[in-house]
A protein has these predicted regions:
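HotDog/MaoC-like acyl-thioester-processing domains
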Residues: 4-33, 94-100, 108-166
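Generic structural detector for well-ordered beta-strands
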Residues: 34-38, 88-90, 137
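Glycine-rich, flexible loop/turn motifs
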Residues: 38-44, 79, 137, 147, ...
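Short, electropositive, low-hydrophobicity segments enriched in small/polar residues
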Residues: 50, 73, 150
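Hydrophobic beta-strand-centered segment that forms part of the acyl-chain substrate-binding groove
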Residues: 64-116, 131
Length: 166
């Protein structure tokens, strides 16, 4: 048990479980991964390049999907996958080489038909500052034709929206 104010919270290992929230996440228990900004991530201004943030968002999105049992092997078996239709990103603060970042993601909306919105938040671990907020609209497509396809029941069951705010 870990102390949490006057209450005791159980220590759990599942990435989507409820636990004390030391960083200021927008939702109680996002799926998270940690990355460190390296010099390869920097642009001419000396901070992490905007394109690198998009790569990190893709990385944490796949990590989350895999944790839900939907890796690309599942997509192939089901003949369906999710592709990005729209990104909305707000860059709130710069990050630099050596900064440790926590990448957080969760499903914000899912119509259980063709589309879902995945939300993201990147928090700098050193000071707890949110450096990026964003979301991506994903569309379910047939892997052979590339045309929109109704979400298989496995997608509907796994990609459930988080409804409670932190």
């Amino acid at each position: 048990m870990q102390p949490f104010g006057k209450w005791q919270m159980p220590t759990v290992s599942h990435p989507m479980s409820t636990r004390p929230n030391p960083l200021a996440w927008d939702v109680p228990a996002p799926f998270t991964e940690r990355v460190t900004v390296s010099v390869e991530h920097l642009d001419q201004f000396g901070h992490a390049n905007n394109v690198q943030y998009l790569r990190w968002l893709e990385q944490v999105a796949w990590g989350h999907s895999i944790s839900l049992g939907l890796g690309f092997d599942s997509y192939e078996r089901l003949g369906a996958g999710c592709v990005a239709r729209r990104h909305e990103l707000d860059y709130l603060a710069a990050t630099f080489a050596g900064d440790e970042l926590m990448l957080g993601t969760w499903i914000q909306e899912c119509d259980a038909k063709f589309t879902m919105w995945r939300a993201y938040q990147i928090v700098r671990a050193g000071d707890g500052k949110t450096v990026l907020r964003g979301r991506t609209q994903w569309v379910c497509v047939d892997l052979k034709s590339g045309r929109p396809k109704r979400m298989p029941p496995e997608f509907v069951g796994a990609y459930k929206p988080v409804t409670m705010l932190a």
